[in-house]
Amino acid sequence: MGRKKIQITRIMDERNRQVTFTKRKFGLMKKAYELSVLCDCEIALIIFNSSNKLFQYASTDMDKVLLKYTEYNEPHESRTNSDIVETLRKKGLNGCESPDADDYFEHSPLSEDRFSKLNEDSDFIFKRGPPGLPAQNFSMSVTVPVSNPNTLTYSNPGSSLVSPSLAASSSLTSTTMLSPPQTTLHRNVSPGAPQRPPSTGNAGGILGTTDLTVPNGAGTSPVGNGVWNSRASPSLLGTAGGGNGLGKVMPTKSPPPPGGGGLGMNNRKPDLRVVIPPSSKGMMPPLTEEDELELNTQRISSSQSTQPLATPVVSVTTPSFPPAGLVYSAMPTAYNTDYSLTSADLSAFEGFNSPGMLSLGQVSPWQQHHLGPATLSSLVSGSQLSQGSNLSINTNQNINIKSEPISPPRDRVNSSGFPQQQPPQQPQPPQPPQQPPQRQEMGRSPVDSLSSSSSSYDGSDREDPRSDFHSPVVLGRPPNSEDRESPSVKRMRMDTWVT
């Protein structure tokens, strides 16, 4: 196969002409080099291109060759283009085709440099492999998918406190009140446990070794340095339950944190299970007296540990969460007037209901109107709570609740017009000797009418028709509060509200 032959005529295209000049010039110099070496001769090549640029080649020194050229009188052979064409014509080439087939494919030094560079680049690419492959080992921040765009990545301020099966958190960055649930926040709960739509609070405070979650959060926002912001939004503490108001407490699937975690889990009761059969919302039968006494015994026995709390409960208005290893039962806090319980707040907790738990569904609208000022800014703290403590609220969404100060004066006038006096301080009922003194330090607030005292109090109080108000979680005032009341005083005050 021969190479392509071109016609020897002037190239009209400027670019093609420049390329051809570069290639053939180098070819000419290459031929001169070969001739000078092979035949031991001196060669001087002088070229002016169409732009009058000088290109020269000399086998040794150009001046020496030119000096020798001027000394000669008569050249031995002198040729021009016409002579070359005539010679070619005689040889049968007719001057129409290139006599040297290799000249067209000769390369200039510049073009060869380009080609060599391209070859090196291609070799480097082929050896390295295709670029852009992602690294196999990479880290990814985990976020909880919620409908609220204000989400935070999960942070673990106390790694020994959080159960791995519940490592999820979301945050409401604004300090507004709670809104009704929009979507379901899926959490890693025990198999078989239904999930409920949470409010838009954050789920800070997942601090138990059982599958206990805080779906609404406790108004806290986990921060990586161990300090927990408590101003996100108020909400209640409870376990993950279904939309029909059911809650299940399943035993933990992860090993308990080490004993140095400071939560007093050494003497917890591992076999405590509260499994509630499914039923429709609002149709939960009350617990029997034997069940309540058994739960009381279990809670009392589970509270006999080196620390006052078996499952720490989160304070809504605590300015900052103490580091891991401290006691969470009697944290000092102050009443905060920023939050009040509105109808939107109560509707956010719809779907929380369980026997022996707090329920607003059976309270008259007038009573709910008076329960509204008792805001969630009081301390959500239980005394010696068991691992399966639950708190649920079920209410109507169309009730208008007036927003009032969190810490009302001692002499108040309710909407009926008669003064409502704070009952005098009364001593606490007799308590079992196994309870630590942390129980006696807990005060009472008007929100206690929403939930009964901790189940370790006198069980006879559960005989009244409002036995469904008994909740293991206590909404209590901080320990520095002065007015401390017994369950009987709360019942009397609830009775005075009914007209």
Swiss-Prot record:
CDD domains: MADS_MEF2_like. Residues 58-86 bind DNA. Expressed in both embryonic and adult tissues with high expression in heart and skeletal muscle. Also expressed in gut, lung and brain of 15 dpc embryos and adults. One of its GO terms (molecular function) is RNA polymerase II cis-regulatory region sequence-specific DNA binding. Residues 265-282 are annotated as: Required for interaction with MAPKs. InterPro entries: HJURP_C, MEF2-like_N, TF_MADSbox, TF_MADSbox_sf. Binds DNA as a homo- or heterodimer. This is Myocyte-specific enhancer factor 2A. It comes from Gallus gallus (Chicken).
